[in-house]
Amino acid sequence: MESTALQQAFDTCQNNKAAWLQRKNELAAAEQEYLRLLSGEGRNVSRLDELRNIIEVRKWQVNQAAGRYIRSHEAVQHISIRDRLNDFMQQHGTALAAALAPELMGYSELTAIARNCAIQRATDALREALLSWLAKGEKINYSAQDSDILTTIGFRPDVASVDDSREKFTPAQNMIFSRKSAQLASRQSV
């Protein structure tokens, strides 16, 4: 059974993916109309200018929507990992601490700097053990609790979303595009 947080993150991820795909479709439609007008006789210059502005805003909207989708995809994976590690520690935390006792013994009495060093050495030991296990080539599967959700969203976000989110905008550019986007939305709702 999934946690409420995981289910909410999954729903957000799916909604963000749908919004990103919708923005891509809107951009494609504007670009098609622009090309159709550009290749036609008796070009409507004002409509071409308007479409150039719409395309510019749509590209920004696609970029922003792709970024939201990618971040929400990462959130689903992060919540799943956190939940499963919490479950693991509930069941096996004592055994893990015992295995790492040479590094962690007396942890609560250590100074902050010494605690950080102890945790770092314990983390290094865990990393080494995990790398050794991975080197055996064992098959890795999603946990049974989260398998449906993780399989649905996929191992990584869609490659196209990564490409769509590559361009970075300054805060000033984001403000300008946000304003243009609101103006475009108000014109289209009339």
From Swiss-Prot:
Keyword Nucleotide-binding: no
Keyword Ligase: no
GO biological process terms held by the UniProt record: symbiont-mediated activation of host transcription
The protein, known as: Polarity suppression protein
Sorted UniProt keywords: Late protein
Function recorded in the entry: Late protein which functions to suppress polarity of amber mutations in the late genes of the P2 helper phage.
Organism: Enterobacteria phage P4
Matches recorded under InterPro entries: Phage_P4_Psu
